[in-house]
Amino acid sequence: MSPCGRARRQTSRGAMAVLAWKFPRTRLPMGASALCVVVLCWLYIFPVYRLPNEKEIVQGVLQQGTAWRRNQTAARAFRKQMEDCCDPAHLFAMTKMNSPMGKSMWYDGEFLYSFTIDNSTYSLFPQATPFQLPLKKCAVVGNGGILKKSGCGRQIDEANFVMRCNLPPLSSEYTKDVGSKSQLVTANPSIIRQRFQNLLWSRKTFVDNMKIYNHSYIYMPAFSMKTGTEPSLRVYYTLSDVGANQTVLFANPNFLRSIGKFWKSRGIHAKRLSTGLFLVSAALGLCEEVAIYGFWPFSVNMHEQPISHHYYDNVLPFSGFHAMPEEFLQLWYLHKIGALRMQLDPCEDTSLQPTS
């Protein structure tokens, strides 16, 4: 038995001893006995773990420093893990090869709903994953406020393949910090509902907004939740009808589910992983080199100065939906072992930039 197993058994026995000591001659009701068993089993399976708070994490990063050296062995080992668990090369997107006509699939974010691939959806899929694999040098760009005044735009645009999250603004006021290049951009159905009224009245506005992404793939989780399917299909038809440069790819729910299980087995307990972690996971399986930017979910920067939540606004997410500190710690670990590079310091000297 492992030391962890022995410790858990000792914890359970200790709890039983406390109950016996406090109630030496008291017989617990049947319901209370069952509840005690459930609690003790829970403690055995999920021992108590306290996640470091924001200040502790920031201090830990400062103490360890951001110095980095690429570890080809670690990168290959993690890529192999991604291939074994999730097969991003074949399952990253819905294709005619992995989603044939008549196949039944489950929504990855709902347990009660499934769907069947019919002619109306099958015709929207590419024959296979449309990338020349492996991708060489990838940049995954989050939207964290740490990017503001970072001067990382040029470095980001030097990557061969740039992935971005949730249709971020790329206007000229931001390009010095976040770049302008993109090959793949995610778009959650919730964004289509909130910003573009489900494309019921604002198709032109949507098409105009998409032009900044040039020839990017628009990656959408159309089959994660049943409510997301219709908005995602509208995006596909809208861009197709106007002959837009962008191409819609639908995330394969089996891939998303596998990624979720992979990270849950490594200690991330959340209702759902963030879009950023999904993208980084895919990049680690598809790319030879991965650098990530804007993945800093804290309210202060590396100099412990206050920063906005996003580089373009300070709108906070709903609490409890994602486990951002846990995700950060996992990515920070991959940075420290050299499997990916996490950019936290400014890329260029921005001290002479005028303040806004």
Swiss-Prot record:
Changing R272I: Enzyme activity is 19% of the wild-type. It is found in: Golgi apparatus membrane. Pathway: Protein modification; protein glycosylation; Lipid metabolism; sphingolipid metabolism. GO terms for molecular function: alpha-N-acetylneuraminate alpha-2,8-sialyltransferase activity; sialyltransferase activity. Glycans are attached at N71, N119, N214, N245. Strongly expressed in melanoma cell lines, adult and fetal brain and to a lesser extent in adult and fetal lung. Changing R272A: Enzyme activity is 20% of the wild-type. A 10-fold increase in Km value for ganglioside GM3. A 5-fold decrease in Vmax for both CMP-N-acetyl-beta-neuraminate and ganglioside GM3. Disulfide bonds join C138-C287, C152-C347. Changing S190A: Enzyme activity is 33% of the wild-type. A 2-fold increase in Km value for ganglioside GM3 and 1.25 fold increase in Km value for CMP-N-acetyl-beta-neuraminate. The keyword Protease does not apply. Its EC number is 2.4.3.8. It is a single-pass type II membrane protein. The chain crosses the membrane at residues 30-48. The keyword Magnesium does not apply. It is an enzyme of class 2 (transferase). Residues 1-29 are cytoplasmic. Pfam families: Glyco_transf_29. Belongs to the glycosyltransferase 29 family. This is Alpha-N-acetylneuraminide alpha-2,8-sialyltransferase. It comes from Homo sapiens.
